[in-house]
Every structure is written in structure tokens, then in C-alpha cells.
Amino acid sequence: FAPGARVIHIDIDPAEIGKNRVADVPIVGDVKTVLQALIPQIEQLHKEYGKPDLTTWWKLLDKWVEQYPVAYEEPTDGTLAPQWVVQQLSAEADPNTIWVSGVGQHQMWATQLIEFHHPHQWISSGGLGTMGFGLPAAIGAEIGSQQYFDGKKPVWLIDGDGSFQMTSEELATAFMEGTPIKIALLNN
């Protein structure tokens, strides 16, 4: 984990603070409440001292993107590379799509290969490793899309065969709740 980083850990449960990594700044509290209190202080610091110059940081990120491009080998046996499938879905999908990912290699491919057009388009369990997360999360995203966006934001689930098997029985829930999610199931 970034050895030079200062870690600010905010958690409502004091037992979680510093559990996986020593926190330089441990804060026990609800993250929403803590951030609402911190934001005005940060804005005041920006007024007094200016915002930090992130030009060097962005140049470094651009260099890494150029130096380590996302690449994959095309199969020679006539099958489709899962990365190609994700890339094609991204290219063809509605730009307002809400993308959901299960846990596994497909999660990394989706993170790297989907082109996001707007904020709040990506739902993933991140590094928590919660296999089976994808389908229930996609159902929830679709219900949210119907309630808040009149269903105008389609939901795509990118999932792997192992992750999908953890909660595949929830397809019945998706059907009963009328959630027309789309699923790309990758068998790698």
C-alpha cells in the first residue's frame, strides 16, 4: 500500500479503525457527518492558501497510462477474449448506462475497459472481494433507475461465472420485481 501515503480512516465502528492499515488520522464517526464538517474547513483553507497544484500528479498519471496501456491477447482458438466483450459492450451501450460488476478478473477488465461518460455510473464492491455482489447490486441499481430516472438509465452487469453462481438464484427476484437488467456473463 502506497508507502508514502498519509491515511485518514473514517469509520463509524471504532473496531474498524486501523484494522488493515495504521491510520495516520483516525476519525470515528459517520462518514457523511464527518465529511460535511470537513468540507467547509477545506474550502476555508483553499481560500487562505489556494488549492494545491496537481499538474505534476496529473502528468504522472498520464505517463503511467501511456507507459502501461490496457492490452490483452486475442485468443487463437476462435473464442472471444472476455476483455473484447467488455470493450464492445462499452462501445455499444447507452452512454447513460449504469455499470455493475461482480468480483473477479472481469471486475478489473470492466474497470479498465468501460468508458464512463458521467459520474455515478459504476457500482462495484471495490477491493472487498465480495463474490456474488454483482447480481443483487444490479437489481438494486435497476430499481433505483426506475424510481429516480424513469428507467432511462439501463443497467448492465458484467459478471464472471464463479461470482454469478454465488447469487444466481436472485434471477427469480429480478424477474418478480420486473427489473430488466442486462447481464454479460464471462466464463474465463
Labelled PLM ranges:
Residues 11, 102, 161:
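Acidic active-site catalytic centers that drive phospho-/nucleotidyl reactions
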